[in-house]
Swiss-Prot record:
InterPro entries: Disintegrin_CS, Disintegrin_dom, Disintegrin_dom_sf. A motif (Cell attachment site) lies at residues 89-91. This is Disintegrin piscivostatin-alpha. It comes from the Eukaryota.
Length: 111
């Protein structure tokens, strides 16, 4: 589950890599999107935003990093448990970081 999440994050943060190619099947394979019939190189000079928490070449967290993004992630580390990451709205309580994830807990719906 975490590896899938990291791949999703890295693909979102690093959508274009100089060595990547777009092929015609839609499958992600190593550092390219695969389409079987046609190969189209990505444009040169495509924006490559830097995220110090995520290694774009491997799509994994950099050494010492616990997270790459999220309301409970600060400088590649989980924020301490108890910090408010989403203020109360209506009948919902404040949402607080768990200290074990970079994501703010999901909203709970009460009947």
């Amino acid at each position: 589950m975490i590896q899938v999440l990291l791949v999703t994050i890295c693909l979102a943060v690093f959508p274009y890599q100089g060595s990547s190619i777009i092929l015609e099947s839609g499958n992600v394979n190593d550092y390219e999107v695969v389409y079987p019939r046609k190969i189209t190189p990505l444009p040169k000079g495509a924006v490559q935003p830097k995220n110090p928490c995520c290694d774009a070449a491997t799509c994994k967290l950099t050494p010492g990093s616990q997270c790459a993004e999220g309301l409970c992630c600060d400088q590649c580390k989980f924020i301490k448990a108890g910090k408010i990451c989403r203020r109360a709205r209506g009948d919902n309580p404040d949402y607080r970081c768990t200290g074990q994830s970079g994501d703010c807990p999901r909203k709970h719906f009460y009947a």
